[in-house]
Amino acid sequence: MRKIALFLSLCVFIWASDLQQALEYEKQGDYKKAMEIYKKLALKNSSVLISQEQNNSSEATQMQNSITIKKEEKQDFSRLALANYLGENESFNPLGISSYKMNYFLPFAYSFNSLGVNNNKSEAKFQLSVKKRLFENLLGLDEKYYIAYTQTSWWQIYEHSSPFRETNYQPEFFIDLPLYLKDYEFFNNLRVGILHESNGKGDENLQSRSWNRIYVSTAILYNKFLFVPRLWYRIPENKKDDDNPAILHYMGNFDVNLAYLGDVYFINLMLRNNLKFHNNKGAIQVDLGYDIFNNGIYWYLQYFNGYGESLIDYNKHLQRLSTGFLISY
């Protein structure tokens, strides 16, 4: 704009000088020279107007392009925000924290079995689970190092004072290793981790539960089916300090998740078993989710049958039906 103003000022100065000269010729009676100057001024004025229109057109085009770019940037920002919400874009998240396991709140969780003295069979259940990447490629294998934290709580919200009946805490550290198998592209990752799980209770009431595991897992995606097997080894404890010596008998050494991921819904099946023909123990959990608002918030139904839903109930058979909302899968 500054250049255009200077250019227009120069044109006005030249135009005024020529006009003064034409008027002098006209006073002297030399109408021919005066008309030539008037004609010249008319042509200059026309060219200035054309130039100004072109500049205005150019500015309008630039402004329109700017608006278009801003619109595209806004659309890109929306896509980044959505990708971040789904945990697909860590660069958008300044803390690098993303969802890990399911995050849900189930205000209606009904147990068909007794939950102990003074406990209501109806309660709420919720889970929070996050992870953060620490490092990557330290060994030159494109591996990634994570810490994660999962907390699952069973909350007696329908009782007076609404106490928490049980809360399980799971801090863990794991490494994701990529696998480069040309003939098995759907099998392309391996996870190795160490997991601590406890309910944070003291020994004085004999309700303390904890154990430590080393595990190996993988995730196999084929079309819309996701298969996640996991094997673990319990780190041995001193018998005097072991709060739950028989936990492997009820929890086994593995679990398997098989999911179908639709466009607006998912179905997940979890199986766990001790693989013993005599005195067989295990658990099954079925998860159903439907994106009712098309915004990533799912109506969620959970059915559990077996042992080990929580650490305090690891050796008790429970059958439970729960429903509520899920915000990440």
What is the predicted function of each stretch?
Residues 266-292, 297:
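Glycine/small-residue-rich hydrophobic helix-like segments
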Residues 52-122:
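Basic/polar, acidic-poor N-terminal "presequence/leader" segments
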Residues 130, 301:
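Conserved, mostly hydrophobic/aromatic
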Residues 1-79:
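Cleavable N-terminal export/targeting peptides
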Residues 38, 42, 298-300, 307-311, ...:
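A cross-kingdom marker for long, charged
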Residues 318-329:
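Outer-membrane beta-barrel "beta-signal"
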Residues 126:
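Gly/Thr-rich phosphate-binding loop signature of adenosyl cofactor/nucleotide-binding cores
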Residues 25, 96-117, 121, 135-263, ...:
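Outer-membrane pore/translocation modules
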